[in-house]
Amino acid sequence: MLLHSKILGDSENHILILHGFLGSGDNWITIGRKLNFKGFTIHLIDQRNHGRSYHSENFDYQLMSNDLLKYIKHHKIKDPILIGHSMGGKTVMKFSLEFPKLVRKLFVLDISPKEYPIHHQSIIDSLELSLIHIS
């Protein structure tokens, strides 16, 4: 399956923006529009299990890196600039380590390249309980 995105512009120079946990590409629309005016094609990507992209029980950075590779190949993007915020930063770091020749530039925002313990599980559990009560 292919990740959902909003694409702004039609330049040969592509910037792919990946949002943080519980976000979507829409979080970056204002910045995306400004970068588009600078002559770039902007891809505001909804990562797996977020926004309008597909949802799966499988969820890790290896899978998200592979999702990004499929997206880049599908859209025939050459030498993209990658911007990743928080969880998106981890995704683009993983991707860049695996496919360094496919990346022109990398910008990682609000996360560092280290191991983080799982700490969002209580939020996810609460959201699942809320959905059960709504149903």
Give, region by region, the residue ranges found by the protein language model.
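Short, conserved structural micro-motifs that define repeat-unit consensus positions
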Residues: 19-26, 47-50, 58-59, 82-94
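Short aromatic-enriched loop/helix-cap "lid" or pocket-rim segments at secondary-structure transitions
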Residues: 55-57, 117-121
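Conserved small/polar residues in nucleotide/adenosyl-binding loops
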Residues: 132-134
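Short, hydrophobic alpha-helix immediately C-terminal to the catalytic nucleophile
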Residues: 29, 69, 93-97
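Active-site loop/oxyanion-hole signature of alpha/beta-hydrolase fold enzymes
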Residues: 37, 43-83
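Conserved HGGG/HGGXW glycine-rich cap/lid loop of the alpha/beta-hydrolase fold
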Residues: 7-54
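A short loop-to-beta-strand scaffold at the N-terminal edge of the catalytic core in hydrolase folds
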Residues: 1-7
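Conserved hydrolase catalytic core segment
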Residues: 78-117
